[in-house]
A protein has these predicted regions:
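MFS-fold secondary transporters
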Residues: 89-94, 109, 182, 276, ...
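C-terminal membrane-cytosol helix-exit motif in multi-pass small-molecule transporters
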Residues: 172-191, 208-218, 236-250, 487-492
Length: 495
């Protein structure tokens, strides 16, 4: 194709920014409607987490394939196929009649969306000269930052005005517009050589991830290792990981070059980005059921609360314009401390909390996210170049998504387990034979001889037990952010 026929780079930048906005919006918009979905599809708390984790696992698995797919199909066709499949999966998610069907289409949506951000970034960088990359990436990043702000607010308003299906349907027109832009403004570029993919290692790692995620998602419901099913998933995860490690150490060109891990900063960067992933989306998944179930807030209010996180992230990314002036180790430490502080503040809530009690911790958590992303990336790739940089990028983003899916599952398990344990401890005290409940300042207007009064007390016990489960999950969130801090001291950095 001649140079005259190539679209203006500004149109390419606008298209790639829109595609990134679409994907980032989808990551947060759905979380607002999780309580509605749970009720409409008769899902349990652990099942509703699958709506999020299935998307993240599919994204983690498909992200490393981006380079290979782009070399095979071309950037234009890959972008068109991904956005088209994303649109179809979004529509199918809105039509889902069961939790299993919804989880399947969310996985398809995640798999289709996985290549969009790295592919769009590569297209933008290839469309502009190197001296303009800094300014261009800043504009491109607007899509990634704006999506998490707009997604929850718009999704919450639509879910309240209509129902949860509208949240998925709203993505379709955005996707169709992005689809048309991809076809008009994205052009293929010649690649120097075909990219070889280690399919054996990829399939082994995928099997290990699938086994691990299914074990975590199904464990609490099935009774953990007393269940043959959970033992089977654990065996699949262990066997897949073992075979992947053996294959990686013996293959001439493995899926993950083990020599990358000899680079100290990159290895530490992988641990840091894994923990970053653990902290990134967990509050977005845990909070909506708590806000609806404990406080009874509508979807629109939940959307604004989650949108606070996006605002905090925007501020954090804005501050990172000056990142080159600071030692990234200090910024990483500050980012994780802000995450820990946000988790601690959420763990201090009581059942009578107000919107402002949750709004500001979420904004603080978002600020921590914004402060962490750039310095962790700077540290991880400070000593990688060329082909090693491309390979390291794939592993880097994959581990971030795995961290998110694993921690969401663990947090959900903790909420369910501690709720059941707390309910078991509190419930036996609700009895007409409990003399403490007969005291006037305890009993209030309730008549312990009336079944309706006892039922009301039991409902409050269930509410209190559920609150304990959520508070414990936020304690764990805060502890996770603090545990990683000593690793920052091992990072080597020179200006």
């Amino acid at each position: 194709m001649s140079k005259a026929m190539n679209p203006h780079p500004a149109w390419v930048l606008a298209t790639c920014t829109a595609v990134t906005f679409l994907y980032s919006m989808s990551l947060t918009a759905v979380n607002v409607s999780l309580p509605q979905i749970q009720g409409a599809l008769s899902a349990t708390p652990d099942q509703i987490a699958w709506v999020v984790t299935s998307n993240l696992v599919a994204t983690a698995v498909m992200t490393p394939l981006t380079g290979w797919l782009a070399a095979r199909l071309g950037a234009r066709r890959l972008c068109f196929a991904c956005v088209g499949t994303f649109a179809a999966a979004s529509a199918a998610s809105g039509l889902a009649g069961s939790i299993e069907t919804l989880v399947f289409w969310r996985a398809v949506q995640g798999a289709a969306g996985a290549p969009l951000v790295p592919l769009s970034q590569a297209i933008v960088l290839a469309s502009y000269p190197r001296e303009r990359h800094g300014a261009v990436i800043s504009i491109f990043g607007v899509g990634a930052v704006l999506g998490p702000v707009v997604g929850p607010v718009l999704g919450g308003a639509l879910a309240e005005a209509y129902d949860w299906r509208a949240v998925f349907y709203m993505m379709v027109p955005f996707a169709v517009a992005a689809l048309a832009a991809c076809w008009m403004f994205i052009r293929d570029r010649e690649t120097s050589q075909p990219i070889r993919l280690d399919w054996t290692g990829f399939l082994m790692l995928s099997a290990a991830l699938a086994g691990l995620q299914l074990m975590l998602d199904r464990g609490e419901r099935a009774g953990w290792f007393s269940s043959v099913e959970i033992v089977a998933w654990a065996a699949l995860a262990a066997l897949g990981l073992y075979l992947f490690i053996v294959h990686t150490l013996t293959s001439a060109r493995p899926f993950l070059d083990p020599h990358l891990l000899r680079e100290r900063n990159f290895a530490l960067g992988l641990v840091l980005i894994f923990v970053f992933g653990m902290l990134n989306f967990t509050p977005m998944t845990i909070l909506p059921p708590m806000l609806e179930g404990i406080a009874g807030y509508p979807d629109s209010v939940i959307g604004w609360v989650l949108g606070a996180r996006g605002l905090g992230t925007m501020v954090g990314f804005g501050l990172m314009i000056y990142a080159s002036r600071f030692d990234p180790r200090w910024m990483i430490g500050l980012g994780f401390l802000l995450q820990a502080l946000a988790g601690w503040e959420l763990s201090q809530l009581d059942p009578g909390f107000g919107v402002h009690d949750v709004f500001w911790p979420m904004a603080l958590q978002g600020l921590g996210v914004g402060l962490l992303w750039v310095p962790i990336t700077m540290v991880a790739f400070s000593r990688l170049e060329g082909e090693r940089l491309a390979e390291g990028t794939a592993v880097y983003h994959m581990l971030r998504n795995i961290g998110s899916s694993v921690h969401i599952s663990l947090s959900t398990v903790l909420v369910v387990h501690m709720t059941q344990m707390s309910h078991g401890e509190l419930s036996p005290n609700v009895s007409r034979y409990n003399e403490s409940l007969s005291l006037p300042w305890v009993r209030g207007p309730l008549d312990l001889g009336d079944q309706q009064s006892l039922a009301a007390i039991q409902a409050e016990v269930a509410r209190q037990a559920s609150m304990i489960g959520y508070l414990d999950s936020f304690w764990a969130f805060s502890a996770t952010a603090l545990v990683v801090l000593p690793l920052i001291l091992l990072v080597r950095w020179k200006r």
